[in-house]
Structures are given as structure tokens and as C-alpha cells.
């Protein structure tokens, strides 16, 4: 006969990302980017777009965590040197996730990385600098 699985291991690929999920991801991103003096913020539009049907396949919390972890490892210092009002796009070539962001200097002089939106799109075009990565190194997990 057919075995019924105890848990749906692909559940998060269909489940929408909740505000509470994004809050946890933001805390994680804040912790790692604090090393280069950057605070991470998500816009309201980011939350709307993370669950958008145009992504074709749902963007998962683990993909967003990977996006921040890998972009920090490859571009953390570079991002911190871009300066106030700089705009760029973080691009994960493995998952085709793109995250346009802007850097703002707060009144306290801290740099804030504001993730404007997020989308899963192959060959994403932007006039801003594209910070791409593909390789996923497991040694820091």
C-alpha cells in the first residue's frame, strides 16, 4: 500500500510568509549586518510582494535567510561602503530571488538597508548595481 507522510515537508513552499516570519528574518539580518554597522528594515511593500502570485513559486523564509546570509558573506563590507542614498539589487542566482534596496543614513548616523521589495524573477533587469551570488557554502550553517 501507499504510505501517508506524517508531515508535509513542502508545506512552506505553499504557505504564505507571515509578518511574524519576516520579523524573525529581519532580526536575523540585523544581527549579521550589525558587524558592518547596518540596520535592516523591510517596507510594507516587501511583505506584500513576498507573497505575490507573480513569483510563480512561493518565496520561503529559508530562501530569504539564505539571501541575507550569502549577500552578507560576499558583499557585507562592500554594501557598508556604498553610502547614503545608494541603491542596488541583491540577486540570488540559485533561487532567482531579487531584492532591490536603498541605504539611508539615520539621524543617529547609522546606515539602514531598506529592502524595498522582493521577487522571484529570472534575468531581473535593473539600472542599479547588481550584487549577485550563486554558491551556497555550508560550512557556516
Could you describe each region identified by the protein language model?
Residues 1-141:
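Ribonuclease/tRNase effector modules and their secretory precursors
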Amino acid at each position: 500500500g501507499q504510505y501517508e507522510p506524517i508531515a508535509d515537508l513542502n508545506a512552506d513552499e505553499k504557505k504564505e510568509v507571515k509578518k511574524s516570519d519576516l520579523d524573525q528574518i529581519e532580526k536575523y539580518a540585523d544581527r549579521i549586518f550589525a558587524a558592518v554597522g547596518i540596520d535592516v528594515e523591510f517596507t510594507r511593500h516587501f511583505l506584500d510582494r513576498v507573497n505575490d502570485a507573480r513569483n510563480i513559486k512561493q518565496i520561503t523564509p529559508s530562501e530569504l535567510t539564505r539571501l541575507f546570509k550569502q549577500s552578507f558573506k560576499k558583499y557585507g563590507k562592500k554594501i557598508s561602503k556604498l553610502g547614503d542614498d545608494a541603491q542596488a539589487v541583491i540577486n540570488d542566482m540559485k533561487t532567482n530571488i531579487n531584492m532591490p534596496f536603498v541605504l539611508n543614513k539615520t539621524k543617529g548616523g547609522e546606515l539602514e538597508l531598506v529592502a524595498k521589495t522582493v521577487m522571484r524573477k529570472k534575468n531581473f533587469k535593473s539600472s542599479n548595481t547588481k550584487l549577485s551570488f550563486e554558491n551556497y557554502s555550508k560550512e557556516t550553517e
